[in-house]
Amino acid sequence: MTTPFKRIHLIVMDSVGIGEGPDAAAFNDEGSHTLKHTLEGFEQDLPNLQRLGLGNIAPLPVVEEVEQPEAFYTKLSEASVGKDTMTGHWEIMGLNIMQPFKVYPDGFPDELVKEIEDMTGRKVVANRPASGTQIIDEWGEHQMKTGDLIVYTSADPVLQIAAHEDVIPLEELYDICEKVRELTKDPKYLIGRIIARPYVGEPGNFTRTSNRHDYALKPFGRTVMNELKDNNYDVIAIGKINDIYDGEGVTEAIRTKNNMDGMDKLIDVVKHDFTGISFLNLVDFDALYGHRRDKEGYAQAIKDFDERLPELIDNLQEDDLVIITADHGNDPIAPGTDHTREYIPVLLYSPKLKDKAHELSGDTTFSSIGATIADNFDVPLPEYGRSFLSEMNVEK
């Protein structure tokens, strides 16, 4: 069967929101605008995102509106009740998440800590939000002496357990994380991911190893990715996409080290023949800059991404479609360190349609991205969202 686009490459710029969502007040996020606030005072331009039409979606510093953008453009609001990475990504692929994952800005409750201690026979230490390197520097030597579990979290709904590989063998750490995963499926906790964070080294020189393992929840329903896989299309997950969906609907998973490595891996995928989708998450915007409220670093990361777009575009086939979007906001000037409830930008670029691009109606949800992908490959559409193909005047 011939499809309008043989391949769709979906890129999520993690946390790159484009202004407060219609229900931002309910999340205490009035006035949030990740892109605008990140780019204010930035002295470099973003010529490639500009020519695609990013500045046509909303007024932005250093990104001007253009008369004829090369990409179709709009912005979408979130229907689900959370503003975390998993919720945003699951909605992009067609789900509406009505029960929010829980975050723990003050650490995990005593009841859960006691359950973990009773189950493992090991004491829990730390129990607060922290960066992984920081918490290991602080507690690593103690952990080596005692065998305690370093438990910590972040602004995301995650519970991370760090332990020295010479003190708690990997298999035991993995077993502990599997058991904690089962514990935290309880609705009163509902944590999105449990992460094993092994490290090695000596005090003052600890390093985390590549033996990290994520124990996610499976999506709360079938996604567009499941439909694609079941219909023998390729679903190539790049970066943390495989973890976000717990492997559901994925045919190939490719790990990445950072944003630029993610772009390298995507461009390599684009150079090889396949039929279906590639799906890349660029996490640095969120993890390295948004949560840390590093406005300058965030802006430079967007510039670095902008500079990679010509190489990506030059390697596209005529019947490829690239979708650039986000999953939530993370305004670097907002109070605290949490995500912000924002619209997400959507740019849809295809070499065969770049002279015909225009604004798309945006009165719909993140799921319209998944609906567009499903419509293109003629697989069952999600219950939520609306395909943009007809508005793009794409013949099926």
UniProtKB/Swiss-Prot annotation:
List of residues binding Mn(2+) 2: D286, H291, H339
Cofactor(s) demanded: Mn(2+)
Please give the catalytic activity noted in the UniProt record.
2-deoxy-alpha-D-ribose 1-phosphate = 2-deoxy-D-ribose 5-phosphate; alpha-D-ribose 1-phosphate = D-ribose 5-phosphate
Alphabetic keyword roster: Cytoplasm, Isomerase, Manganese, Metal-binding
Q: Does the record's keyword annotation contain RNA-binding? A: no
Subcellular localization is given as: Cytoplasm
PANTHER family (alphabetical): PHOSPHOPENTOMUTASE (PTHR21110:SF0)
NCBIfam families the UniProt entry points to? deoB (TIGR01696), PRK05362.1 (NF003766)
This chain belongs to the protein called Phosphopentomutase
